[in-house]
């Protein structure tokens, strides 16, 4: 997409039920599919990106692959089609794409994500905690305790848990590379 191809305001209103899907958008976002060229800055690295199927996470996944990283992306199962589209771009960059559907707020799934990434990609160097949940309410008092909990489980607790799980395997992976002189 060139500058002249990009849509200009005013934009048509667009609403989607959670989770939003790129394939269902009226105006498709630019994740750098046609514009970003890498230069090998992440050659040989292994990355896990939560929410890597759309938005900023998708752009990061494509950029990291074009910089030379193998990329695992996590996403909600309803977003499979979006995830497959991003995997296509990772593969096209000559890198390995690993798709891990599930809910990051589930501690068992978080462990599964780290284990699969290490097992299938051979380690973990980079963790991008990109996935988030937010629901709009007109009035503060309309926010239910369940919505509040879901927001914190996804945006705070899951981030903490993934970092807690990733740090030991990342250090192990780093030490193994240092020992081999890589």
Named regions from a protein language model:
Residues 1-43:
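Non-catalytic terminal and boundary segments that flank Rossmann-like NAD(P)-dependent oxidoreductase
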Residues 40-73:
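Canonical Rossmann dinucleotide-binding motif of NAD(H)/NADP(H)-dependent dehydrogenases/reductases
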Residues 69-85:
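Conserved glycine-rich Rossmann-like NAD(P)H-binding loop of the short-chain dehydrogenase/reductase
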Residues 80, 101-114, 145:
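The beta1-alpha1 cofactor-binding region of Rossmann-like NAD(H)/NADP(H)-dependent oxidoreductases
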Residues 93-96, 116-129, 135-136:
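A glycine-rich helix->loop->beta "capping" turn
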Residues 115, 119, 154-171:
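Amphipathic alpha-helical dimer-interface segment in Rossmann-like NAD(P)H-dependent oxidoreductases
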Residues 133, 141-160:
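Catalytic Tyr-X3-Lys loop
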Residues 172-179:
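Conserved small/polar residues in nucleotide/adenosyl-binding loops
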